[in-house]
Amino acid sequence: MEVQTECSEPPPCDPQPPGKLNKAAFKLFGKRKSGSSMPSIFSVRNKGESTGKAAGKTLELVRSKTHDGLITDTPSELDSHRKEESASSDQLHAGTPDGVSTAPLRSSITKSFSFFSLLRRSSSRAGDGTTTVGRRGRGLKGLFSSMRWRRKPQIQEDTLEVAKEVKEGDLILSSSSGSVKTEKDMTLTLEPLPQVFEESPLPGDSDKWKVASMQGIQGTNEVECGNCGPSVSQQHTVTEESPAPSPLRVQTGGLQNHKHSSSTHLSSIPTCALTPPMEHSTADPQSEQSVDRLCSMFTDVTSLKSFDSLTGCGDIIADPEEDSGNGGSATSSGTGSSSGGCMGRRLSGAGTNSERCSPAKPPLPPQVSSLASIHASCYMPAHQRPRAAPKKPQGSGVVAYMGGGEEMASPEGVDDADMQGLWHMLPQKDEDSPAPRRAEPVLHHAPARLEKRPPQVKALGLSKIPVSGSSKTGKQQPSRPSPPPVDKELQDAPPSDEGYWDSPTPGPEDEDSTFLRRDGLLRDSCSGDALYDLYDPDSPSAAGSDDDASSPTKSAGDLKMNLPSPKCSSSATSSFRSMKGSTSLPRDSKIPISVRQTPPSHSSSQGALSSNLSPTSTTPPKKTDAPPRTKIPVSKVPVRRSGGKSTSTSQSRK
C-alpha cells in the first residue's frame, strides 16, 4: 500500500520544464524537487530498501503458505494413492485365495508409506538446511555437508525397504507381468557397483579367490585369457546350482554379465538369498575395502612378476645362480630369463595360486635358463660343438668378452649351461670382427685344471686352426726358425704399437710379457701405476730375447726354457682372475688384434704350446730364473723385437 500511495503523489510535482532529466525519476518515486540530485539518490536507495523489505515480507508469507499447504495436502494424496493401489491389486488378484490377496495389500501399503516417508524426509531436510544455513552462516559448504550426512542412511533405509517389498511381493511374481518388470528394476538397484568383491560364505571362499586372481591376471597376461574364460563360465554354472552364495559369485564372475545374469537368476532364486548380501555389505564395509585391497595387490604382484620375467629387471632375478648368467652374456641370460618367465607364467596360469601370492618367489628361473641354453647348444652345427667341449676356458673367455673386468664367482653347474650358449653367438669366420679377438686370447691359456686334461686342450687348439685363416696342420713338427718370418713380423708389429699406447710399455703382441704382467697383477693392487711398477721385475723374457738377438737358434732355445714358465704359471692362476683390474683390460683385449694382422696364427701355436707343455715337469723350476734379469729398463724397440721373435719361434717350434 505504501508503494501505491507514493506513486499517486507525483501529479502535484509537475511544474517542472519537460526537458529535465530528473523528471522520470521524480515521477517514479514521488519526491519533491530538491536543490541537488544527491538527496534524490539517497531517497531512492531508502525507497528500494523499504520496497525490498515489503516484498520480502509478502514472499515469506507466500512461502510459508505453500509449505504448509504441501504438508497438509500430502496425507490426502497418500490416502488416494493407497486406495487406488489397493483397488488395482484387488482387481489383479480377485481369483486368488485370501492369504495371497492380503500380500498385495501389504506391499501397496509399504510402498505408500515409503513414499510418504520420502516426502517427509525431503521436506524436513529442506527446512533444516535453510535454518542451519541461516543460523550458522556456513554457506554452500555447510549445506552440502548436511545434505550428505543425511543422504547416506536414507539410501540404506530405502534399499532395505525395497528388499522387504521384494520379499513380500515375491509370491505374486509368476502371475502378474507388470510386477515382474518392477521387480527387475528393483533387483538392478539391489546390487550397486562397490559391492563387487564381497566376502562370500565359507564354502565359496576358494572359488572367489580364484575368480579374483584370474580377473587380476586377465589384464596383465594375454596368455592366461584362455584359462580365465572357461573358469568364469564354470563359476556361472556353479551359481545356477547352488542357491545361497550364488549372487556373490555372479558378482565376482564378471561385471559385463552382471545386469543380464542378475535379472535372469533372481527370478528363480529364493528371496532369502537376496537380503543377506545387503545386510552384510551395510554392516561390514571394511571387509569390502580389505578384499579390494587384496585383489589390487594380487594384480600388482602378477604384473610385476610377468614384467620382470620378460624384461630381466627387478629383484626377482637377483639370485647368485642367475648373476653368472646375466653377467656372462646379454643374449643367453635374456633368452633364459624370458623363457623362464614364460614357463613360470604358464605354470601359474594353470591354477597354482600359491606361487601367485608370493612376490619374491621366481618361477624356476635358473633351471629353465640352463635348459634353454643347453637346448641352444644342442642345436648348434657339428663344426661348432668341439669348441663348446672345454668348460673353464669358456668362463674366462666370457669375462674377457664382456670387458667389465670383474671377477665373477659363479657356480660350475651354471657355467656349463650358460657358457655353451655363448659359443654359437661369437662369429667364427670373419677375422675383422672384434668379438672373437677379445674372447680368444684368454680361451687358449687354460687354467690350472686343464693341466690335468691335455686332450681337451688339444681339441681346442685343433678347432681353433681354421679360425685364423691359415692352415697350420703341417707346422706342428719341431723346426728351427728362419730369419724371413722374423723380418716380416718386425714389419707388421710396429704399426699396431704406434699411436695406440701413450706410455713406453710393451707392444700388445708381446705375449709372454703380458702374461707376466698378469701374474704381477695378482700380487699387488690393480691401479694403473702398479702396472708400470710391476712390469719391470717381470721383463726377463724381453731382456733375454734382446740379448740373444744375434742368433735365432739360441733365442729359440731360451724360449723353450723361458716361455713355458709364464705360460703355465699364468694359466694356472691368472687367466681367470687377472680381469680384476679394469686398467689391464685394454692391453689384454688388444693382443689378438695385432696377432691377427700377421699371417701365422697365435691360436694354433698357443693351443699346441699349452697342450705340449702342460705335461712337462721342467716348467716350475724355470720360473725362479725370471727375477735376476730385472736390470734393463722398459723401452719400445726391444719389446718389439722380442715380441716378433717370440711369435716366430713359438710358431716354428711346432
UniProtKB/Swiss-Prot annotation:
UniProt feature, compositional bias: Low complexity: 565-575, 601-621
Biased composition, class Basic and acidic residues, residue ranges: 60-70, 427-454
Its membrane topology: Peripheral membrane protein
Cystine connections: none
This protein's UniProt keywords: Cell membrane, Lipid-binding, Membrane, Wnt signaling pathway
GO cellular component: plasma membrane
Primary location: membrane
Comp. bias regions, Polar residues: 468-479, 576-586, 644-654
Region (Disordered) residue spans: 1-105, 224-289, 316-369, 381-654
Cell compartments where the protein resides: Cell membrane
Record-linked Pfam families: AMER (PF09422)
Comp. bias regions, Pro residues: 9-18
Entry superkingdom: Eukaryota
One Gene Ontology term of the molecular function aspect: beta-catenin binding
UniProt GO BP: ectoderm development; negative regulation of canonical Wnt signaling pathway; regulation of canonical Wnt signaling pathway; Wnt signaling pathway
Record family assignment: Belongs to the Amer family.
Reported function: Negative regulator of the canonical Wnt signaling pathway involved in neuroectodermal patterning. Acts by specifically binding phosphatidylinositol 4,5-bisphosphate (PtdIns(4,5)P2), translocating to the cell membrane and interacting with key regulators of the canonical Wnt signaling pathway, such as components of the beta-catenin destruction complex.
Protein name from the UniProt record: APC membrane recruitment protein 2
Species: Danio rerio (Zebrafish)
Record lineage: Eukaryota, Metazoa, Chordata, Craniata, Vertebrata
